[in-house]
Amino acid sequence: MKIVAICGSHRKGNTEWMLNKLAERLKENGAEVELILLRKTDVKMCLACLKCEEGGKDRQGICKIQDDMNAIYPKLTAADCIVLGTPAYFDLMTGLLKNFLDRTCAIWPHLEGKSLAGVAVVEEGIGQAIQNIKSYGDICGMKWVGSVTGLAKNPGDIAKDKSVTRRLLKLADKITDIG
């Protein structure tokens, strides 16, 4: 089973920790996992030029923008499951993750039927970050596996919450059971 985890955080902190903890268990369960840190990529904003829509549902990740998405598209289309992680900014996913998701327009027909999971770090409440991720999956025709949210503000806070760790391990098991 191939899993691509996307970290939409601007810093190395709680979201990345959650994705790494999830990836650890997924690997123990025999999955092949790649973590992509969006903060270390060059992913430009979508220009809404619609070049990617040429070819209809047969489109193959053709985007006129030449950046790191060209290397990421094949990883997403080859994955059985995609895990999206984000801290919540004003209750929503980060702009970094939203920008990335906008750029997947070039391949969205190839995401249909894939599994999708989400993790989010929030300072208070649950916010809409996970609902944003789930809505993205619904639009792409993906199968929702589940999510884990954790409360934290400062880097390292989330690792202290043992219930988050337990829920991450359960989510990892659920992902590999489906695959």
Which ranges hold each PLM region?
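N-terminal beta1-alpha1-beta2 submodule of the flavodoxin-like/Rossmannoid cofactor-binding fold
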Residues: 1-86, 91-99, 106, 158-179
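Conserved residues at the C-terminal ends of beta-strands
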Residues: 39, 85, 122, 150-151
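Short, surface-exposed, charge-dense and proline/glycine-enriched linear segments
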Residues: 63-73, 115-120, 142-151, 176-179
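Short, glycine-/small-residue-rich phosphate/pyrophosphate-handling segment
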Residues: 94-95, 106-150
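Alpha-helical membrane-embedding segments
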Residues: 136-138, 154, 174-175
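A short acidic, helix-capping loop that chelates divalent metal ions and anchors anionic groups
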Residues: 152-158
